[in-house]
Design a protein with these regions (language model features):
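OB-fold and OB-like single-stranded nucleic-acid-recognition modules
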Residues: 32, 49-240
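Sec-dependent bacterial lipoprotein signal peptides
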Residues: 4-9, 13-47
Length: 240
């Protein structure tokens, strides 16, 4: 009482009510649990329970080894790449007999393959006794122009002799798929290594013999991105 006037007193936050107090208790409990978990995790890290892996040895822990495209291609070239090309190879004259001037329309015929993102199909082909009519070793992408036995049409058939473009070999292999690689970089590196293999193991040994008038036997792949040109990347190349 103060001067005869009654004064009421309430505890702090009492106006929130019982429900409000309970909600605050739950919130505080959650915060406490979160804090405890953070402290525990920090303690685990500081006690040496996490294995430290040296740079370059991450694969020992993750199981994913460093990708080496050169080793990968070397391991499959003689045992898988060449055998598949030789098995699927179609004589260029057979292709020209049916699709001369409309090579982009072949699709899956002749075991044509392409990647999901690609617009054009790739094919394994062969030639025997094809005469070299022109040699270009000066251009950035060197080629020899070949005369296909029995063919008199306008389609130009060439064989790459370095440097090399396109990915027809990689993309025509049934056992190589983009999903098998970690990223686009590795996918591209495999193609680069394949073209390096072509240079060292296929073209270089016969490079000096590539001259007008010589005849060649070859097995290789090409991408049908033109209706009147076949540019072959060889996996087997013999010069006579």
């Amino acid at each position: 009482m103060c001067g005869g006037v009654p004064i009421s007193y309430s505890a702090p936050f009492s106006h929130v009510g019982t429900a409000g107090n309970e909600e605050r208790k739950k919130t505080m409990a959650k915060r406490l649990i979160s804090t405890v978990l953070t402290v525990v995790m920090a303690a685990v890290l500081l006690t040496g329970c996490v294995k430290v892996v040296k740079i370059g040895h991450e694969g020992d822990l993750t199981g994913q080894k460093e990708f080496n495209p050169g080793d990968s291609v070397e391991a499959i070239w003689d045992s898988e790449v060449i055998p598949e090309c030789e098995k699927k190879a179609v004589d260029v004259s057979d292709i020209l007999a049916k699709y001369d001037g409309k090579l982009t329309e072949m699709g899956e015929e002749f075991d044509g393959l392409k990647t999901k993102a690609a617009s054009y199909y790739n094919y394994a082909v062969k030639l025997e006794g094809a005469k070299i009519t022109k040699v270009d070793k000066d251009s950035f992408y060197g080629t020899v122009t070949l005369e296909v036995p029995g063919y008199t049409g306008k389609t130009v058939v060439t064989c790459q002799i370095g440097k090399y473009k396109n990915s027809s070999i990689r993309d025509d292999m049934s056992f190589i798929d983009f999903s098998d690689f970690t990223n686009q970089t590795e996918w591209g590196q495999v193609n680069t290594s394949m073209l390096e293999k072509v240079e060292e193991a296929v073209v270089k040994p016969v490079y000096d013999d590539l001259a007008e008038g010589a005849t060649v036997n070859l097995v290789g792949c090409f991408t049908a991105d033109s209706n009147d040109a076949i540019v072959i990347t060889p996996v087997v190349l013999e010069v006579k």
